[in-house]
Amino acid sequence: MKKIAFYSILLSLAAFSFSCGGDDDTNPTKPSSNQTSISNTNVNLKVGETANVVIKNYDSLVFVNNSNIATIEKIDSLNYRIVGRKVGTTFIDLKSVKCNITINRYYAYFRDPNLSWGEGKNIVKSYELRLLKTDEPSSLLYQENNSVCLKYVHYLFSDYKLSSINMYFLPNKTVELNNYLNDYYMQSAQTDPEYDLYESPLPKTDPKFFNVKVKKTPVNFNNADYILITLSNPNFK
């Protein structure tokens, strides 16, 4: 009788241990499926292109940090569409996950000028691949030989710091000019009788922000007529 009771206790203990499981449990607790996610954390587009993404488990409003560069449209409860607007980089912050967005130019007519505002000549010289025509104390003039529309890039320095850039376009290349402006710049709310005014898509508080003005009538430069575009940083005059 005592043996029967003893074996009964052993069987009870074995059953209890099996039901409780242990380190070798074949069915561990699964992590929560409520974590916020986005189907693509690095989006690369050209201006005007779109990309669809799926966002799960995020109840707040979804927006792009800089809506001048890209925007996001809600299609349904999970699907969204990112639209490239202007050349630049921005992001979508979903708190626990981030989506980086890079918008590239749609039209590639020439190499961008160097925009190292406030820097000296050496930064520009190390960047430029164009033909250096003149090197003066307050300016560097480069000739563009690999573009159908741009002829010269003229860097201007104030107190040895890059403050503005003049770009000289061929006057018969208005389509290319407009494509370039559309890729890169926002139209300004201000007006000027002599210039069409634009600005970079960055916030005006950003030290890299700059203004853009396009002369409405051709200007004479090096004995030829051109359309003048001036980029200028308000922090360096």
Task: Write out the residue ranges for each language-model feature.
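Positively charged n-region of N-terminal signal peptides that target proteins for export
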Residues: 1-4
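Sec-dependent N-terminal signal peptides
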Residues: 6-11
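C-terminal motif of bacterial Sec signal peptides marking the signal peptidase cleavage site
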Residues: 16-19
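Short helix/turn-capping signatures at newly exposed starts of structured segments
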Residues: 24-54, 60, 67-68, 77-187, ...
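Solvent-exposed beta-strand/loop surfaces of large extracellular or lumenal domains
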Residues: 71-73
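Short, exposed beta-strand-loop hairpins at the edges of beta-sheets
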Residues: 93-94, 210-224
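Short, solvent-exposed loop/turn segments that connect beta-strands within catalytic domains
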Residues: 146-148, 204-207, 220-223
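Short Gly/Thr-rich strand-loop-strand
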Residues: 187-208
